């Protein structure tokens, strides 16, 4: 092991991301729907942010949380997909050790932040349906700002130790990672030392952060559904159930692939085919950013009408 391949005595200069193992011959074709999904995510989330930002009537808490969700979706997909496409189309898998850690930090912290936003959105719907008279008092702009700050602080605080846990490990020249982007356990498994601390801390973060978030979200929607079924108007019930159904669907799409990835990395590493694991890991950074503007935005009457109005004004000006 030569000094030219190592820095800080034990840290590699670069890693090499291989893409989806076992499907190398299909990389070019797999990248096409990935690219299409990324473009849809960019356009959809950017349009949602633009519509909410331009219309003062949409500066209510629910829409501000939607705007935050779209911002995190843009950040999550843009952190991973461009490099993913470069690997699948151009075989440009090399990434510096520092760049890999930076991508890992961004992916996990943004994901944790998005989990916090989904929890905040569940709380928003709970207050709106179960305590509507106090809605504007409980969720004013100052409270929303504090919720956003706490979510950001929590995500950075729980993910930052990953960097130090990975930098302490020796890698013994192991540089090839069978993945399309850098994540904590993918890097840790390249080490030639005991990674029990990494496994335990990663599992603790997953359970205490996103696991706790998902439980609180489930409790919130339990109260919401109980309140909805006691509404006197069938139209009000249908509207509330339609909104909640969209929210629950995107929450399931967000959490299920993530928990599958976390758990297989730690307990089913040899039982689950590698290409299945990596393919699902790609989907959980692609599917939510694509679906969020559709399920949360396009199905919301106020946003849909303002978007159509904005498009009409654009055509008129042309």
Swiss-Prot record:
Localization per Swiss-Prot or TrEMBL: Cell membrane
What's the name of its gene? OR52D1
Report a single Gene Ontology molecular function: G protein-coupled receptor activity
The organism sits in which domain of life?
A: Eukaryota
Q: Name one GO biological process term.
A: sensory perception of smell
- Source species taxonomy: Eukaryota, Metazoa, Chordata, Craniata, Vertebrata
Q: What glycosylation sites does the entry record?
A: 5
Q: What is this protein called?
A: Olfactory receptor 52D1
* Location, primary (coarse class): membrane
The entry sums up its family as follows: Belongs to the G-protein coupled receptor 1 family.
Per the UniProt record, which residue ranges are transmembrane? 29-49, 58-78, 103-123, 143-163, 200-220, 241-261, 278-298
């Amino acid at each position: 092991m030569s000094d030219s391949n190592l820095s800080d005595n034990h840290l590699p200069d670069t890693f090499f991301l291989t893409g989806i193992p076992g499907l190398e011959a299909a990389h070019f074709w797999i990248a096409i729907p990935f690219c299409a999904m990324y473009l849809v995510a960019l356009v959809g989330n950017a349009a949602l942010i633009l519509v909410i930002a331009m219309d003062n009537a949409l500066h209510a808490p629910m829409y501000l949380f939607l705007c935050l969700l779209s911002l995190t979706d843009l950040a999550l997909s843009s952190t991973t997909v461009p490099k993913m496409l470069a690997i699948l189309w151009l075989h440009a898998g090399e990434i510096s050790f520092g760049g890999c850690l930076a991508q890992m930090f961004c992916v996990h912290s943004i994901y944790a932040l998005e989990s916090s936003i989904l929890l905040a959105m569940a709380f928003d719907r709970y207050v709106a349906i179960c305590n509507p008279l106090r809605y504007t008092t409980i969720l004013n702009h100052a409270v929303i700002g504090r919720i956003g700050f706490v979510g950001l602080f929590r995500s950075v605080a729980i993910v930052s130790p990953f960097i130090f846990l990975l930098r302490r490990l020796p890698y013994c020249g192991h540089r090839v990672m069978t993945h399309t982007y850098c994540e904590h356990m993918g890097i840790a498994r390249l080490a030639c030392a005991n990674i029990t601390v990494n496994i335990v801390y990663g599992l603790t973060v997953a359970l205490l952060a996103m696991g706790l978030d998902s439980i609180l979200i489930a409790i919130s929607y339990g109260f919401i559904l109980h309140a909805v079924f006691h509404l006197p108007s069938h139209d009000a019930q249908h509207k509330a159930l339609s909104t909640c159904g969209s929210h629950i669907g995107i929450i399931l799409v967000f959490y299920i692939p993530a928990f599958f990835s976390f758990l297989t990395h730690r307990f089913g590493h040899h039982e689950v085919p590698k290409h299945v694991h990596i393919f699902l890991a790609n989907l959980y950074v692609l599917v939510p950013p694509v679906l969020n503007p559709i399920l949360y935005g396009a199905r919301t009457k106020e946003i849909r009408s303002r978007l159509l109005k904005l498009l009409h004004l654009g055509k008129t000006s042309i």
